[in-house]
A protein has these predicted regions:
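Hydrophobic transmembrane alpha-helices and their membrane-interface caps
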Residues: 1, 72, 80, 471-571, ...
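Transmembrane alpha-helices and their membrane-interface boundaries in multi-pass membrane transporters
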Residues: 1-2, 35-54, 62-101, 214, ...
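Interfacial helix-loop-helix hairpins and adjacent transmembrane helices
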Residues: 2-29, 58, 64, 83-135, ...
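Extracytoplasmic/periplasmic membrane-proximal domains and adjacent transmembrane bundles
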Residues: 16, 20, 249-251, 282-468, ...
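Solvent-exposed, membrane-proximal periplasmic/extracellular interface segments of envelope transport
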Residues: 20, 171-265, 290, 319-341, ...
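Signature of alpha-helical transmembrane segments and their immediate interfacial
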Residues: 27, 31-34, 42, 46, ...
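Transmembrane helices with small-residue packing motifs
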Residues: 52-62, 132-168, 223-225, 254, ...
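Short helix-loop junctions at transmembrane helix boundaries
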Residues: 53-70, 148-151, 439, 480, ...
Length: 647
């Protein structure tokens, strides 16, 4: 996009009524006039995007390829605009050239633009006041926006992750899974359902049998019922899948795997409770859950079970086994072989070997009474029941012991739907701060999940954005060799923020890393157009000085005004083409609905809005500020500072 803009600026500067014999010389002079500004504007776009490489974690992996691609393209563009473009112009731009005044489009644009710029100069306080007011309004709009780590990506599928009680049996969880799959298939938008309970056949999956994972593949949107959204489908499925003893959870397959790998949390947000005793941790986690209930945006609220697992305790009676001439190992061996099985031998089938195990049948070990009747063989007293030498009972314990940093851990899990992540967690933190004083000594809380990523990315962006502005200012200073001219171009950045803030507010987009990257790209585009305007305004000042000299006695305020208007109106068409090319490239993305458009739209929205407002500011306000600066110079120093634009 910037490459086409650079060629347009260079080409439009040759559209003058010139004799054929001086064509090459005029082309050379025209290219030299804008080459420095065009080159440095391209460099500014490159350098302003460099801080994106400072992003780390998931956001870094997502946006680094974009930054690399844009950087390499713009480096090639910066080289071509000062080497190849002049050569191509000399090859293809031949014959008779018409003046810009003969172009009907240009005449219409100038007839519209000149009264506007004269009105802005006449009502300068009103013009500046309106711009400052618009900028002031954009600040509370930005502050009122929600916050999230990354825009939610529609994967085209759902992951249903319900959990049951920790003591659920294999047969019961299988029945629940079948019932759930049957209910899910009744929704018209569902194409396929694939569910599993427990862990996969891998050593890295520690999912208990009480955890169910069901992948729901959805049909194409064209086959959905009219007006249905993904949120509506989730709500409908959730209402139909209300099964006693089962807590529902909804997410998407890819983001779920990313969350579990990066944070160890399978939901959007996890509140980790650390301590020394599992019962105390679980009791406090239940209190946290009760406080979180009713908060807008908190969905699928659930306390990870760390108690409630069922165990069979076999406590050997040492006095009794001594009476029967048995040892503890003898009793344990009987229990192990009866319940877990004992390896008897190994069978060889070809190159494969299989162990042969034996254990009691299901009917002899599926209840406490049957276990008590297990026969234990003695040397002198024959077979005796197991209950004669051991106490057998059911007890409760942790179904899984989770620890982190050598401390026991419990977790309160929930997803965020229907509200932004930042404000949801902020409200939850305010509500839970009152409970912090009631935490027992040695216990503490830690927020995890996507909120952990949000905090990290916000800290990085607070460092990146000031660096972007400093880099842009330094690049413009080296381009103009004047801090005043650099500041005049840089002032377009906050006014570009106006359009970006307005459009993301009315579009209903939350602030995220994607929006921040869009603003970073916008700042480079805004300054790029401002540099061209400053070049032509300084060119007009050169013409004024060449004609009337550079002193208070020869230059009047009226002269300054007329030459500024002439410089602003000069090459109006390529300036507007810059805006149009940017909009034509970006606007189609706003109406895209394919996979990935959820991430692209937050990047593009601030760029579209910012290009519109920055273009308005550059065309109407930049000449006004430039004129006021020159009037101040003439009044204070008796002459004006003229920037050399021909190199």
């Amino acid at each position: 996009m910037s490459k086409w803009w650079n060629k347009m600026v260079g080409r439009s500067d040759t559209y003058r009524p010139i004799p054929q014999d001086v064509r090459i010389r005029i082309i050379e002079g025209s290219c030299k006039q804008v080459s420095r500004g065009v080159f440095f504007s391209t460099v500014i776009i490159i350098t302003s995007f460099m801080p994106v490489f400072m992003l780390t974690g998931q956001e870094g992996k997502l946006f680094h390829p974009l930054a690399y691609t844009k950087t390499f393209i713009m480096i090639v563009d910066a080289i071509l605009v000062v080497t190849l473009a002049p050569v191509l112009i000399s090859f293809f731009m031949k014959g008779r050239f018409r003046p810009e005044s003969s172009n009907p489009i240009n005449r219409v644009l100038e007839k519209i633009y000149e009264p506007l710029i004269r009105g802005c100069i006449k009502w300068r306080k009103t013009t500046i006041g309106v711009n400052i007011l618009a900028l002031a309004i954009s600040v509370p709009l930005i502050v009122s926006l929600g916050r999230e780590f990354m825009p939610p990506l529609d994967e085209g599928s759902l992951l249903f992750m319900p959990v049951t009680l920790p003591d659920v049996s294999n047969s019961e969880v299988k029945r629940i899974l079948q019932v759930q799959d049957k209910i899910i298939t009744t929704v018209p938008e569902v194409a396929h359902v694939m569910g599993k309970a427990g862990r996969a056949n891998t050593a890295t999956d520690n999912s208990p049998i009480s955890m169910i994972e069901t992948i729901i593949l959805l049909k194409p949107r064209s086959e959905w019922r009219k007006g249905m959204t993904k949120e509506d489908i989730i709500n409908e499925l959730n209402s139909k899948l209300q099964i006693p003893g089962v807590t529902n959870g909804w997410t998407q397959p890819i983001i779920n795997r990313i969350n579990m790998l990066s944070t160890g949390i399978r939901t959007d947000i996890g509140l980790k409770v650390y301590g020394q005793n599992l019962d105390t941790i679980y009791a406090f986690a239940q209190k946290l859950k009760k406080e979180l209930e009713g908060i807008d945006g908190v969905k699928d609220l659930y306390v990870e079970p760390i108690t409630g697992g069922k165990y069979i305790d076999v406590a050997v009676k040492r006095e009794e086994i001594g009476r029967y001439g048995l040892s503890v190992d003898d009793v344990n061996a009987i229990v192990e072989s009866a319940l877990g099985g004992m390896r008897l031998t190994t069978t060889v089938e070809g190159r494969q070997r299989f162990s042969v195990n034996a254990r009691f049948g299901q009917d002899f070990r599926n209840n406490i009474t049957s276990l008590k009747r297990l026969q234990v063989q003695t040397m002198d007293f024959g077979p005796i029941p197991l209950e004669a030498v051991a106490d057998i009972k059911l007890s409760e314990g942790p179904p899984m012991i989770n620890s982190e940093n050598a401390m026991l851990r419990g977790t309160v899990l929930f997803n965020v739907r229907g509200r932004d992540l930042g404000s949801t967690v902020s409200e939850a933190r305010e509500k839970l701060d009152k409970m912090m004083i009631r935490l027992p000594k040695g216990y503490f809380l830690e927020w995890s999940g996507q909120y952990e990523n949000l905090i990290r990315s916000e800290k990085t962006l607070k460092l990146i954005l000031p660096i972007v502005l400093v880099v842009i200012f330094l690049s413009m200073y080296f381009a103009f060799h004047s801090a005043r001219e650099a500041f005049l171009s840089l002032i377009t950045v906050p006014f570009a923020l106006i359009g970006g803030a307005y459009i993301i507010y009315f579009w209903g987009v939350n602030l995220s890393v994607a929006v921040a990257v869009g603003f970073i790209a916008l700042f480079g585009l805004a300054v790029e157009t401002g540099i061209v305007m400053v070049i032509y305004l300084n060119d007009a000042m050169q013409q004024l000085v060449a004609k009337k000299g550079n002193s208070r006695e020869t230059i009047t305020r009226e002269d300054l005004k007329e030459y500024v208007i002439a410089g602003a109106a000069k090459r109006l068409r390529p300036k507007l083409m810059t805006v149009c090319v940017s909009l034509f490239a970006l606007i189609p993305i706003l109406w895209s609905h394919g996979v990935g458009s959820d991430v692209m739209k937050p990047i593009v929205l601030p760029m579209v809005g910012g290009v519109l407002t920055s273009a308005t500011h550059i065309l109407l306000v930049t000449p006004l500020i430039f004129l006021m600066a020159k009037e101040y110079e003439l009044k204070k120093y008796g002459k004006i500072e003229v920037l050399e634009v021909k190199h």
